[in-house]
């Protein structure tokens, strides 16, 4: 059938004036030339006759050749005897130019980035039919021996006419047909400029569609929902090697590998079935090194295991990281397990471990950049030399060191315990957000052979955790690979030794030397042979007879050749004696009898009434109520017996005869419906012959060659095969020596990580790519339960979500809501399910099942109605469906907790609390961990609450659970740069520059508020809403409270619209208005650094007043100019006569001739005042300055005499509550690059002392992290220009970090001189006013700024302090070093708790934009950070220095020098 658009064109040209017809026609163009018969001929098959020799064609170049419907691989290959009818059919199809593959010969040009920003520029007329956006072309060199092909999709921006440099190209490159970016295409395609290439338009894209694409990302935290959206944007486009990819206008990654049919290709086309894999070159890697007994053994070549690690493996890994310029954050931990029993470990049986063990973990480096490989190697060698001594020596009662037993071998070690300990920092997905690193990866290096004895319960618990986090695990073995399948876990269950291969980890074997296939490698260690010398082999007592191979022995090469030849042989049928037949077996689980035919779950069947959402009592509406399945109803029971009649339900198994033993039947039945822990994929076949028949085949019941045939022949075999292939944690192996790795890999496709492996690619012995760039958990998966599993193993719940038009997330349509619901799940670990099982489950749904409506990626807005998507995570499956009325239905399937699992999770657990001994980086002793690594489980979420929250119902989730992604920043003083902010004709002090910079930063935040309508603009743009003060915060707030009247109302600054002024007002009148107590400025006595300025105002407040009250002043700049004119006329002046009018925190006073004398006679704010009968002494702190109307004070209406009231103090006085921070919905995407609103909640302090840290906190749920990172970078640059430093710090207090991250380094430090007990320093006047005066003075001398006050500070007398982000809960006062590298806590007993600020260190080391030489700069940062810690610890231990410092502090003491902070 012809395309309608082309049919009219062809019909017009079909007939000539003379009535003759033509076989093939091409649309005429304006510039045509007649071609010779030989040139214009089209040869098809063996036909020698030219077709329409007088045909006219249009070409761009004279030498161009037109080939119609021809492919390189000769899809069109017709013989001479082909009928004329077939030929006519082909020619008729070619009349549709849209479906015709056209090839031309062109010259390729190359351009630089300065010429064009696009990778490809193509002329629309390069082919006669024209080039249109969306078409796919293939470019191939005509040089012999060059097979590289480049496939690309034409976008509108790639067309030559769409470029802005058309005139330039016409002048410099008039014959340009196609131009490629010189870098990388010239190297990638190995083409010289002006080379002749063949350009072919492709119609059938199957030949160029790729199977998988690997994208490497670096220095960006690309969340999984962003990966899903990014993958969706790539569908329908082409990719090529080393292509730089952009997402929402920002560069996020580079295409490194493209696979098709098991081969690496240069480029290809991406469709919805292409697997897109993301690997991170800036990951967080936790590397465990197991120092078991074998680590001190040596190989057959004499190399000690640890030397093999430290001299071979680590250097190669670091070298690859350095060559690829990766920016990983590395944590290296040494661990081992010490046997405390007197039983030799060799007496332990398979699967057994010593009952009494002591585990040790030594942190070598903690979140250090991978560039510091030299320092890491040095620390590793040092720690290895001391590790055995530190772990095996123990003090006895007599104070002597004794050796406690020995180190366990790797097979009996604590591998799973180490994995659980590494997962503790990953269980909470919302804590410690890192915007520079994507993906967390765990690597375990062991000297073992890949066989580990474990406890079954611990293996199950670890498997559950690994299936609930998106972190991968690599095990690297230093030994030779064994002859059995690996990794192999061995455990005892019900008295039986079991073997299994976990699906959540991968294993590698490091072999340094290249070995030949014929070389024999010993797999076992014989001590006598290892200790023999070269000349001792004749005299040795060990006599080992030579191994004589039997005649039937085959080499590995022969076995592989035999396997390859057997692949294409016909499938063998199972012999007659091997057929299995069974009696009728009644299944354990049957469809329950439905007592109520109108129940919700029963409404979905053919024989039941259709589902009625409007009147179903169990379907949630806006309130989010979920359906509670009955006690008798397991899983989907009634829901998923769909399209089946009652007979099928009652008898799911076919009728068979009784030729199989009863034990086998019981085993099958038990296997199908086992209540055991995980669904185990068994390596052996489930059925055996009744009579064993000798056979030369391998000793398995059914070989792999006829297993497929057996499954096809028997439905009883096929169904269990479907059931056991999903939801599994491991593959059970009956005989590890007989199981091949290939078989295990084929059955391991049920792993949720299976999509990262390209099809038909041979797995290598060591996975260097995984070490170089760990892979992210794929956003899609083919793993899905069978229909039978959904019926029996899952419970079902349903609720409906409606969009509230007034919602915080600015969602305007159900389309946006559904997309956000999917993205939130992907971000928290879910995967999109696809495949035959998903289609089957959807097809059997009644009445709304529609396979064609299942989506893998989100559709366009006009196509989303009726779409449904399946997502899976752990033991949950979510089906999100948008009906045609715009309502979103969410159906949740949760796996039933089976009996063995209930014993662990609900009853008395078999797993003991696990608190191993950990020694962090800077500590000297091993101390017990502060977190139970095994009991700590990943965070679970109430998805009904989440969905209702996204829909706009804020009360659906409690406030304490709304702590999502969060970051905390502090702004600290630093050196003034040379290009610092300045004001013309003004000389600002460093403090004034910093204060102005802080005001500008808050101004940027205020101006960046998310706007619903960008056209709405307010005339009045008030300045920064920050109140500056010096001295004691409590005294300042107490005086602020005195200035509020008893009702809590404040005088309005704005005067009525009818009383607005203009610039014609006279100075005396303006002076009177400015000094009016109700509508004028606030004239108070202000103190700054112990110097008092009477009756003054702030410059920024005057500017705001002028903007608000003058009708002819529109901007703050106009107000500043007008105010300067007033100052020049003598209306007011600077308090120190140093500045003109500046829109900032500068003090001014009225000239004497304009001062209102009546106002001066009134008492000052700083005089003694009475409030509720209590006197408050005069203070040196400054009062409110600007924006005071937003500083909230809440007076309780409760009984003033109530001692328990939170708003009254012990004396019955009314307590004033102050909110010292303000929250702003900040737009991080002001240029609207994203398809959705992108904003975060910013909390900033409204009260600030320039000598302390200023706080900015960010909170968000679903914003794109790249926009947040760009915003923080812009803030950092602004701060640097004003002598400020923006430093990221932990959200929680420092003392809680060891509970959140057990490997985080910290140091407990005591002062060698205690100022509280030293007779020369103990002064009652000082200690009574401020107990921690000496400690504060010492910290200030060491360069530390106050970060957070202790909670006790905020509960004093009649002041109640809160923040917009919540109530402060810091137990101790916290200080940050001026570099931002270290944080110190001041404990109640006067000791210090010091820890590195890893967040800031990671951010600084990852900021490659700061300097060009990244490696040297990063190493300098590491040296500086360690120097800070070493200097502080040395100062605390130096008695002379402390005595001198404390003596100086005592001599400089003043009553108000330091504020009370504890």
UniProtKB/Swiss-Prot annotation:
InterPro entries with a match to the protein in the record: DEP_dom (IPR000591), DEPDC5_CTD (IPR045838), IML1 (IPR027244), IML1_N (IPR048255), WH-like_DNA-bd_sf (IPR036388), WH_DNA-bd_sf (IPR036390)
Location in the cell: Vacuole membrane
A Pfam family of this chain: DEP
Domain called DEP: residue spans: 1077-1152
SUPFAM superfamilies per record: Winged helix' DNA-binding domain
Membrane topology label: Peripheral membrane protein
Compositional bias of kind Polar residues: 7-55, 1175-1185
UniProt superkingdom: Eukaryota
Region (Disordered): 1-55, 688-717, 1166-1185
GO terms, molecular function: GTPase activator activity
Keywords noted in UniProt: Membrane, Vacuole
One biological process term in Gene Ontology: intracellular signal transduction
CC terms in the record's Gene Ontology section: GATOR1 complex; vacuolar membrane
Family recorded in the similarity comment: Belongs to the IML1 family.
Protein name: Vacuolar membrane-associated protein IML1
High-level lineage: Eukaryota, Fungi, Dikarya, Ascomycota, Saccharomycotina
């Amino acid at each position: 059938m012809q395309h309608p658009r082309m049919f009219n064109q062809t019909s017009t040209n079909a007939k000539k004036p003379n009535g003759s017809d033509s076989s093939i026609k091409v649309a005429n163009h304006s510039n045509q030339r007649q071609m010779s018969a030989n040139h214009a001929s089209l040869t098809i098959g063996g036909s020698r006759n030219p077709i329409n020799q007088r045909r006219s064609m249009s070409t761009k170049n004279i030498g161009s050749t037109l080939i119609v419907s021809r492919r390189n691989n000769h899809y069109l290959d017709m013989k001479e005897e082909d009928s004329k009818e077939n030929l006519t059919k082909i020619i008729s199809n070619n009349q549709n130019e849209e479906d015709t593959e056209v090839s031309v010969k062109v010259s390729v040009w190359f351009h630089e980035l300065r010429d064009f920003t696009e990778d490809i520029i193509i002329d629309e007329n390069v082919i006669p039919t024209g080039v249109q956006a969306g078409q796919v072309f293939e470019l191939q060199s005509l040089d012999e021996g060059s097979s590289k092909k480049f496939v690309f999709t034409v976008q509108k921006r790639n067309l030559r006419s769409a470029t802005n440099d058309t005139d330039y190209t016409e002048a410099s490159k008039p014959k340009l047909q196609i131009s490629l970016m010189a870098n990388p295409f010239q190297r990638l395609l190995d083409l010289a400029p002006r080379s002749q290439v063949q350009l072919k338009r492709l119609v059938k894209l199957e030949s160029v569609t790729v199977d998988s694409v690997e994208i490497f990302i670096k220095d960006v935290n690309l969340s999984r929902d962003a990966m899903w959206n990014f993958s969706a944007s790539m569908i329908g486009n082409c990719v090529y090697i080393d292509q730089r990819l952009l997402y929402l206008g920002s560069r996020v990654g580079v295409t490194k590998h493209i696979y098709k049919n098991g081969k690496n290709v240069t480029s290809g086309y991406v469709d919805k079935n292409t697997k897109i894999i993301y690997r991170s070159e800036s990951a967080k890697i936790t590397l465990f090194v197991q120092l078991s007994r074998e680590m001190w053994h040596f190989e057959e070549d004499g190399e000690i295991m640890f030397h093999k690690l430290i001299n071979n493996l680590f250097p190669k890994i670091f070298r690859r990281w350095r060559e690829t310029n990766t920016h990983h954050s590395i944590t290296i931990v040494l661990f081992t397990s010490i046997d405390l029993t007197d039983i030799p470990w060799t007496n332990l049986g398979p699967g057994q471990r010593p009952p009494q063990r002591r585990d040790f973990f030594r942190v070598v480096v903690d979140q250090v950049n991978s560039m510091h490989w030299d320092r890491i190697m040095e620390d590793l060698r040092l720690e290895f030399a001391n590790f055995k001594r530190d772990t095996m020596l123990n003090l006895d009662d007599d104070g002597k060191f004794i050796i406690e037993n020995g180190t366990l071998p790797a097979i009996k070690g604590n591998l799973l315990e180490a994995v659980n300990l590494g997962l503790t920092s990953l269980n909470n997905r919302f804590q410690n957000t890192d915007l520079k690193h994507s993906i967390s990866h765990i690597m375990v290096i062991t000297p073992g052979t890949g066989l580990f004895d474990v406890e079954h319960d611990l293996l199950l618990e670890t498997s559950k955790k690994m299936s609930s986090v998106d972190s991968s695990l690599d095990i690297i073995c230093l030994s030779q690979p064994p002859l059995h399948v690996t990794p192999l876990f061995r455990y005892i269950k019900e008295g039986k030794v079991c073997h299994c291969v976990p699906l959540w980890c991968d294993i590698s074997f490091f072999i340094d030397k290249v070995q030949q296939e014929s070389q024999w490698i010993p797999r076992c260690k014989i001590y006598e042979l290892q200790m023999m010398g070269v000349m001792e082999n004749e005299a040795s007592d060990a006599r080992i007879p030579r191994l004589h191979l039997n005649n039937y022995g085959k080499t590995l090469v022969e076995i592989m050749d035999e396997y390859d030849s057997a692949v294409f042989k016909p499938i063998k049928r199972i012999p007659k004696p091997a057929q299995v037949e069974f009696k009728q077996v009644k299944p354990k689980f049957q469809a329950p009898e439905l007592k109520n035919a109108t129940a919700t779950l029963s409404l979905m069947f053919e024989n039941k009434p259709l589902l009625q959402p409007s009147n179903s009592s169990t379907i949630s509406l806006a309130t989010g109520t979920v359906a509670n399945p009955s006690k008798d109803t397991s899983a989907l029971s009634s829901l998923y017996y769909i399209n089946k009649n009652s007979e099928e339900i009652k008898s799911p198994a076919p009728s068979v005869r009784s030729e199989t033993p009863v034990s086998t039947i019981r085993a099958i039945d038990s296997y199908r419906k086992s209540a055991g822990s995980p669904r185990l994929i068994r390596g052996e076949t489930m059925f055996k012959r009744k009579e064993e028949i000798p056979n030369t085949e391998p000793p398995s019941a059914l070989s792999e060659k006829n297993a497929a045939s057996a499954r096809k022949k028997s439905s009883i075999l096929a169904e269990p095969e479907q059931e056991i292939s999903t939801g599994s944690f491991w593959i059970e192996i009956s005989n590890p020596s007989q199981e091949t790795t290939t078989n295990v890999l084929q059955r391991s496709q049920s792993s949720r990580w299976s999509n990262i492996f390209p099809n038909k690619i041979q797995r290598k012995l060591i996975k260097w790519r995984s070490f170089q760039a760990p892979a992210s958990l794929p956003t899609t998966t083919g793993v899905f339960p069978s229909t039978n599993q959904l019926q029996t193993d899952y419970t079902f719940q349903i609720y409906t979500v409606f969009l509230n038009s007034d919602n915080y997330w600015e969602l305007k349509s159900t389309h946006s809501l559904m997309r956000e619901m999917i993205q939130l799940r992907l971000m928290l670990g879910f995967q999109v399910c696809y495949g035959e099982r998903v289609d089957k489950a959807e097809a059997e749904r009644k009445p709304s099942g529609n396979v064609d409506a299942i989506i893998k990626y989100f559709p366009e807005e006009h196509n989303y109605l009726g779409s449904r998507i399946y997502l899976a995570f752990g033991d949950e499956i979510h089906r999100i469906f948008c009906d045609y009325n715009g309502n979103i239905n969410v159906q949740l399937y949760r796996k039933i907790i089976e009996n063995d699992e209930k014993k662990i999770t609900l009853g008395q657990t078999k797993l003991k609390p696990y608190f191993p001994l950990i020694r962090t980086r800077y500590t000297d002793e091993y101390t017990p961990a502060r977190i139970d690594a095994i009991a700590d489980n990943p965070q679970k979420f109430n998805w009904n609450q989440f969905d209702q929250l996204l829909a706009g119902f804020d009360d659906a989730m409690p406030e304490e659970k709304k702590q999502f992604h969060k970051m905390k920043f502090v702004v600290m003083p630093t050196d003034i740069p040379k290009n610092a902010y300045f004001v013309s004709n003004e000389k600002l002090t460093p403090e004034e520059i910093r204060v102005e910079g802080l005001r500008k930063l808050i101004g940027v935040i205020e101006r960046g508020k998310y706007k619903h309508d960008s056209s709405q603009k307010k005339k009045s743009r008030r300045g920064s809403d920050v109140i500056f003060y010096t001295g004691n915060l409590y005294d300042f707030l107490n005086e602020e409270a005195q200035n509020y009247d008893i009702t809590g109302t404040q005088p309005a600054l704005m005067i009525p619209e009818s009383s607005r002024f203009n610039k014609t007002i006279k100075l005396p009148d303006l002076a009177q208005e400015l000094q009016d107590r109700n509508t004028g400025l606030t004239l108070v006595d202000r103190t700054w650094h112990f110097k008092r300025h009477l009756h003054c105002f702030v410059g920024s407040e005057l500017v705001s007043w002028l903007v608000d009250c003058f009708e002819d002043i529109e901007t703050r700049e106009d107000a500043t100019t007008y105010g300067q004119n007033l100052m020049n006329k003598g209306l007011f002046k600077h308090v120190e006569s140093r500045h003109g009018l500046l829109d900032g925190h500068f003090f001014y006073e009225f000239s004497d001739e304009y001062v209102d004398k009546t106002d001066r006679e009134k008492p000052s704010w700083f005089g003694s005042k009475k409030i509720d009968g209590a006197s408050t002494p005069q203070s040196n702190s400054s009062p409110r300055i600007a924006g005071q109307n937003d500083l909230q004070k809440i007076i309780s209406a409760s009984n003033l005499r109530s001692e328990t009231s939170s708003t009254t103090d012990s004396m019955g006085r009314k307590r004033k509550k102050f909110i010292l921070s303000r929250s702003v919905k900040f737009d991080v995407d002001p240029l609207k690059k994203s398809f959705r609103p992108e904003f975060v909640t910013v909390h900033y302090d409204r009260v600030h002392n320039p000598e302390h840290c200023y706080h900015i906190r960010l909170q968000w749920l679903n914003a794109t992290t790249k926009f947040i990172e760009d915003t923080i970078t812009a803030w950092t640059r602004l701060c640097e220009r004003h002598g400020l430093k923006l430093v990221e710090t932990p959200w929680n207090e420092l003392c809680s970090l060891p509970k959140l991250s057990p490997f985080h380094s910290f140091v407990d430090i005591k002062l060698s001189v205690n100022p509280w007990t030293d007779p020369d320093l103990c002064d009652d006047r000082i200690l009574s006013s401020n107990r921690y005066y000496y400690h504060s003075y010492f910290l200030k001398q060491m360069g530390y700024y106050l970060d957070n006050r202790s909670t006790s500070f905020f509960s004093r007398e009649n002041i109640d302090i809160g923040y917009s982000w919540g109530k402060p809960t810091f137990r101790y006062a916290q200080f940050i070093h001026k570099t931002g590298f270290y944080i110190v806590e001041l404990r109640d007993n006067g000791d210090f708790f010091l820890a590195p600020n890893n967040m800031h260190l990671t951010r600084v080391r990852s900021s490659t934009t700061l300097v060009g030489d990244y490696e040297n700069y990063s190493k300098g940062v590491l040296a500086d950070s360690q120097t800070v810690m070493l200097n502080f610890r040395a100062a605390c231990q130096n008695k002379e220095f402390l005595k001198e410092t404390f003596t100086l502090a005592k001599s400089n003491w003043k009553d108000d020098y330091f504020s009370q902070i504890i």
